[in-house]
Amino acid sequence: MPNVVIIGAQWGDEGKGKIVDLLTRDTDYVVRFQGGNNAGHTVIVDGKTYILHLIPSGILHKEKICIIGNGVVLDPQIFIQELDTLLSQGIDVSPNRLKLSTKTHLIMPYHKLLDQVRENASTTQKIGTTGRGIGPCYEDKVSRIGIRTIDLTQPKLLYKKIELALKEKNTLFTQLYNTEFVNAETIFNEVMETASRILPYLSDTSSILQDAFIKNKKVIFEGAQGVHLDIDHGTYPFVTSSNTIAANASIGSGIALSSTEKIIGIVKAYTTRVGSGPFPTELYDNTGKFLQEKGHEYGATTGRPRRCGWQDLVMLKDSVRLNGFTELALTKLDVLSGLKKINICTSYAYQGESVTYPPQDEHILFNEIKPIYETMPGWEHSLESCTSWNQLPQCAKNYIERIEQVVGVPITIISVGADRNQTLFRDI
């Protein structure tokens, strides 16, 4: 298997964790390259559920090496909690198997506080942040006042960096948001309490990956969130704080762009979104509730109910353009079972015309476009016992083939249930 980048093709929650888990069987390394614990990847193995926020899904496979790259922002306490949870489940998370970049930035307590007070103070436009401190951490990274994992090795320097960061933060907290002054020593002590658990994992992960490529090892790059949450190319400002598209696999892990050969987009059979932002095909009726309940559409990170809607091929084609997907994996096809009719959005109505691309202005996407649907017949019986393409109902096959026709990319993996073995592989 060639080196593969796995990207969520919608607004996140597409089922990337399951697909990464499946493909890990044929790989040697699994790499997280962006985002933080605002992402939740759910993997079900033999009826047992694992929810991973920071550690790559490949950790569930023995002898696979997992890497958290420089593009990730890491909450020390959440990282340790995740380690302990996996240990309690009998999973090997030793430093021999899990590597953490020395360049990874740390989410500090003041980042989480700033995230929360900002969202609470907003009266006009709430982004729907998870409040995990992801955005403020990336802000400090760009402002060159961030704290990196390597700083844990030099406590005196770390303390000075915390003091520097808090000069501005405390002005914001006390004068703009009317919250309490944050003490540098308190923050320092809290962070240093985690150092002994984190330091053994620190590695030059870029060099490790380069060595892996030289030895012809196989690598999966595991994306978080989804294309349309990308800070540059998503539905701004209702986006995350990092680049979620495939090109960032190179930057966020410290490897050459030419190191990746296959890019797989993960797309749900319908569309979901968490938090605020444009959602052209959103359903407010009983069908939307049907998808939400049958699909268990509640966030793995926040528990918030996900907004649900029909498949949007306009947005999916945009994802194909931005990432250069070589193939797609379609998840949760089984959720559509029982619907007599299934709508699929192939274009938007805008100013009396039919357009097949998303408007760049989020106001237009929010208020001025209407989805144009094709209606396809649904299917009644469950798909969960299907083990091959030939066993799928003809209407389900037609649905899959119509998606392929419109976006121009083959669907090679089809998920028909939550468990690892409820997956069909299709040679095209």
Swiss-Prot record:
IMP binds at residues 13-16, 38-41, 130, 144, 225, 240, 304. GTP binds at residues 12-18, 40-42, 306, 332-334, 415-417. One of its GO terms (cellular component) is cytoplasm. Substrate binds at residues 300-306. Its main location: cytoplasm. PROSITE patterns: ADENYLOSUCCIN_SYN_1 (PS01266), ADENYLOSUCCIN_SYN_2 (PS00513). SMART domains: Adenylsucc_synt. Pathway: Purine metabolism; AMP biosynthesis via de novo pathway; AMP from IMP: step 1/2. It is found in: Cytoplasm. GO terms for molecular function: adenylosuccinate synthase activity; GTP binding; magnesium ion binding. Its EC number is 6.3.4.4. Plays an important role in the de novo pathway of purine nucleotide biosynthesis. Catalyzes the first committed step in the biosynthesis of AMP from IMP. NCBIfam families: PRK01117.1, purA. HAMAP family: Adenylosucc_synth (MF_00011). PANTHER family: ADENYLOSUCCINATE SYNTHETASE (PTHR11846:SF0). Belongs to the adenylosuccinate synthetase family. This is Adenylosuccinate synthetase. It comes from Lawsonia intracellularis (strain PHE/MN1-00).
